[in-house]
């Protein structure tokens, strides 16, 4: 810029320097303005007008619409800084001071319409010390604070993908050194990258921040001793939140080590392949296991269900406790319905507690908390005389201090609370001795106005004279213009209108001063009382959060009981055996999408001492993929403590589930279909154990027939004969040669998707039966897909030629394909 900057633009540049990579919204009167590149971004993303002044691009949004526009920007991954102007007292001259008082980023949301109701919203910091990686993540909206440490990038990436943060924080050197890790994360997650000063990630700075935040002199009590990279990440994250984003951190829970409790591990690829949270194709959520299982009534219960779905239990005790509770509520139908109704009245206790702790709560939020806590007492009343299962014992014994708080909120507040403190009418008259007195004065003012209006009408003889109020004028007397000369001299003219004149009197002015004084006093008093009430609630925050956890647990098991009742699910036997036996099992998602009674159930029997691997053959569209996915989903549900869609089941606890299903190019990685397939299969071979469940669909199909067959057989042999890798495996394949493995290994059993023929046309039965498939019916599927009839006919001719004796492999060579 060649021209001299105005004082206001100098001020903008100072704020922009502080905002860094954030889009700066700069308050100018009743608008928030953006300049230069920020103006272009604002105009492009919000569809607002871009203008120029002195060759400076600018665009703006009304101050009254700020929150909605900011949410739109943040939802697109932008970080936004808000520069507010200080109150300018009347008559003051010069430039109004402006400072940044808020920075909003995708991961650091305390209260926003962007917060997913039944999912966490994490900001995650990552750091490296030597070969160790430390991470720390926060959900500011509920105060959850997690840390972890990993010695390899694979486990690090898997952990971050499970947490699914919306914002990632580190320093420049880490981003440069670990570009490959960041690239992988960006391929799996929609994530905003944020950069922070490197010194905040140093041990001395990080520990000091943690000590200050939690008012301790040692981190050993949190179990963090020796976890230097994790401590560095945690301290830097706190510094970023408090010092950079200017957000409160006093409400955070003490840091907990993520993954300390062992879970059934489901890697990101398997979560996607099994469509746990969202379908691979179609609308978001619909067709996923989460959508089928989601019967929760509270946000806390919904978050618990989602987290448990991708982190099922490995501890048998945890599984059994929840199964017992599901069974209890399945049998108690009337109680279940009552609890469902009462749970639906409980709002997000965790996020309400956070809003109150961070001074962001409105009176309406306090009313929501009150109503939710009252609903919790009704739930407790309904449970107190029940012989509850162990999982829920004593969880709804509401502590006396919390009972006292609930009583205060129930008796001392007005039922319908306002959105803003400034609107008043928050507390009952008896809450404070001055409330009733001031309210009476304010209320009596209405009758005084009516009496005064009637009196001066009689005195002046003007029957249409009115006493009115306007924000700009205050109280005034209005008469028609032609009647104004009839008013006495003590009437003081205030304003002339087209057909009316407005006046005041000394008496009316004196009344106005008294009323305004009362209103100011009343607002000041209620504001003070509201702050004191919020502080009183914050003192009970831990008890509220404990009750919130109890509500989430109850909601979780009641919702699973509701699901079991709706679809006639049965309780699986889960134990430490290596059994996998399912009678009349059904795919939980497909079951809900088909007409009742049309889904064909199938059995599964696997045992390490007998069948460890099922080789599944059959044509496309016959149900192979549905069947093998079904087994994995039923195991996941069982280890969540849920009942499952089966007549009966015996499931030995599984430690990991791996899937290799389908294939697709990953152009962003520069990986072909076959490379993706091989990379995912390699991951399975390296990480599967004897207690794992492996689902493989069409391994080796992305290369030549014999290459693919050789790879497929080598994978089968590895999983059958390598100590520590003998996972239960379901392998769907079109390679008929592999079915001969059954003759060479007692742990392999052939099954196929049954097809009947009618006049040469296949009829898919969707039954999985013993033996291998004789035909693939691929040409029939091509015909169903709409191939031109000439192409179908030619394919049949070529197939007959291939099946002729001249093109069949020699017996010796064919036999070599199945030799170990």
Swiss-Prot record:
InterPro entries: DNA_mismatch_repair_MutS (IPR005748), DNA_mismatch_repair_MutS-lik_N (IPR007695), DNA_mismatch_repair_MutS/MSH (IPR017261), DNA_mismatch_repair_MutS_C (IPR000432), DNA_mismatch_repair_MutS_clamp (IPR007861), DNA_mismatch_repair_MutS_core (IPR007696), DNA_mismatch_repair_MutS_N (IPR016151), DNA_mismatch_repair_MutS_sf (IPR036187)
Keywords in alphabetical order: ATP-binding, DNA damage, DNA repair, DNA-binding, Nucleotide-binding
Molecular-function annotations in GO: ATP binding; ATP-dependent DNA damage sensor activity; damaged DNA binding; mismatched DNA binding
Gene3D superfamilies recorded: 1.10.1420.10, DNA repair protein MutS, domain I, MutS, connector domain, P-loop containing nucleotide triphosphate hydrolases
Any one GO CC term of the record: cytosol
CDD domains from the UniProt entry: ABC_MutS1
Binding residue positions for ATP: 618-625
GO biological process: mismatch repair
NCBIfam families hit by this protein: mutS1 (TIGR01070), PRK05399.1 (NF003810)
PANTHER family: DNA MISMATCH REPAIR PROTEIN MSH1, MITOCHONDRIAL (PTHR11361:SF34), DNA MISMATCH REPAIR PROTEIN MUTS FAMILY MEMBER (PTHR11361)
Function: This protein is involved in the repair of mismatches in DNA. It is possible that it carries out the mismatch recognition step. This protein has a weak ATPase activity.
Protein family (similarity comment): Belongs to the DNA mismatch repair MutS family.
Protein name: DNA mismatch repair protein MutS
Gene that encodes the chain: mutS
